[in-house]
Amino acid sequence: MSFKEIKSTLEDMDEQSRLSAAHDIMDDTRKNVKSLGKKILNAYEKKQNEIARVKKLYEFDKQFGNIVIAGVDEVGRGPLAGPIVGAAVILELNVEKDLDLILGINDSKKLSSKKRQELSEIIKEKALAWEIASLDNNEIDKKGISWCNNEIFKIAISKLKKVPELVISDGYAVKGIGIKNHYIVKGDAQSASIACASIIAKVYRDNLMGEYAKSYSEYGFESNVGYGSKDHIDAIKKFGTTPIHRMSFLKNII
């Protein structure tokens, strides 16, 4: 068979048949055929490693028992503009097939924008329940960022279609929810549920800031998403503030 025919045949195979065939063609004397086999084997190994990594995230959550667990996380504590956004996600943790795992989930900051967008849709499809809540800059200026951070979690949790028996959060305890809570340092890198909440919250907020960028084009919100980059601070000094700026965060700038 020619290289083109081999490649076409492999593409039509199921995963296990393709893997077996890849081992076979490693004995082929043609470099391009052998390279194709190596590529398939490397891709399979990479996928298996990812499955093992994500299973650990699911197992982390399952350690708390066979109960309904909501993971919560926020994005937007530190920006000079825009809302703070929180999300709550309940996953099916007792997955029987690897296909049911949400591969790729991680701390949202470690993922590309494109990957976050893709995963956000998958998470919403596969989650048993999810909710997003936000409070704007005016509320942040009135109540303070810490109060708002806790409040968005309370709102998101209260809106979930399933009532969680445990809430796990990233770094901070969630107060006043009337539900048992565990907070975990670097939780978005350890817990599947928190990682998923981290992703959908960030995608929601980034998209919102992208919309604001259309109205306030001088500030670069499409790239800095409200954080205090040099260009953003320079724009504030040159053009002043917008209706979405957090005035309580700008005392040392204006």
Swiss-Prot record:
The keyword Membrane does not apply. The keyword Signal does not apply. Belongs to the RNase HII family. Its cofactor is Mn(2+); Mg(2+). PROSITE patterns: RNASE_H_2 (PS51975). Pfam families: RNase_HII. NCBIfam families: PRK00015.1-1, PRK00015.1-3. The gene is rnhB. It catalyses: Endonucleolytic cleavage to 5'-phosphomonoester. It comes from Clostridium acetobutylicum (strain ATCC 824 / DSM 792 / JCM 1419 / IAM 19013 / LMG 5710 / NBRC 13948 / NRRL B-527 / VKM B-1787 / 2291 / W). Its EC number is 3.1.26.4. A divalent metal cation binds at residues 73-74, 170. It is found in: Cytoplasm. Endonuclease that specifically degrades the RNA of RNA-DNA hybrids. This is Ribonuclease HII. Keywords: Cytoplasm, Endonuclease, Hydrolase, Manganese, Metal-binding, Nuclease. Manganese or magnesium. Binds 1 divalent metal ion per monomer in the absence of substrate. May bind a second metal ion after substrate binding.
